Amino acid sequence: MFCQFISRPAQSLSGKFSSKTLCLPLIASPVRIKHTVQGYSTFNAQQNAGNKQQKKKIPLWPRIRAFTTFTFSGILVIGATGLAGVVIYLIGAELFSPSGDTQIFNRAVSKVENDEVARRLLKCNDTETSTERLKAYGEILTDDRWTRNRPISSTRRIDKEGKEHYLMRFHVESKQKMGIVHVEAKESDVNYQPDFVSMYLDIPGEKRHYLIKPKLSIVKPKGFLGVNWGPKRD
């Protein structure tokens, strides 16, 4: 049993107040303990076991179909990625490679634009402050802008020394005249860019103008049966 102390004011005979302490017993109330009983159902256990059996008993054909679909999708993605890589490489090699047709064409057009004789033959309207810009395009001559932007005609061949030669032909046009430029370039041993071997301009009614004259190779004559008879010449 526990006691609780309470202070209570009291009045004495003389009229003064004083406090008295009282001890009151405390009775503890009973505490109820609740027991929780968890029930177990055999129905849930049987249902879980049935779901596991259904998962294990998946037919073979859906598995094969899912595997085939996944494999085909993977092959398709890998093939598309590889094809895109090849296309990007070809475009990059064509546009940025020193031996690409685009680079050779741009170099040839710059040579024609900077050649005074070619500009005079094309009757360019040049002044002291400005120069006329030439037009350069492919083989087909039409008024259609999309047709003019077709690729330049070019061919490549390998010579006896194993070096690659580049042959190109394109048109240049001013406001008054039009001409055809023939270009031949050869793989260089020193530079990354091919070296121009020959370049000339043909304008109707004008004499052929060589921007770069080809070097004539001297062929030594051979004697009887391929042997040069007689004394050796220095």
Swiss-Prot record:
**On the Mitochondrial intermembrane side, which residues?**
93-234
Alphabetical keyword list: Membrane, Mitochondrion, Mitochondrion inner membrane, Protein transport, Transit peptide, Translocation, Transmembrane, Transmembrane helix, Transport
Instruction: Please give the biological process terms from Gene Ontology that the record holds.
Output: protein import into mitochondrial matrix
Q: Does the keyword Protein transport apply?
A: yes
Q: Name one Pfam family in it.
A: TIM21
Report the locations given in the UniProt record: Mitochondrion inner membrane
Q: Which GO terms describe its cellular component?
A: TIM23 mitochondrial import inner membrane translocase complex
Similarity annotation = Belongs to the TIM21 family.
Subunit comment: Component of the TIM23 complex, at least composed of TIM23, TIM17, TIM50 and TIM21.
Q: What is this protein called?
A: Mitochondrial import inner membrane translocase subunit TIM21
Report the source organism: Kluyveromyces lactis (strain ATCC 8585 / CBS 2359 / DSM 70799 / NBRC 1267 / NRRL Y-1140 / WM37)
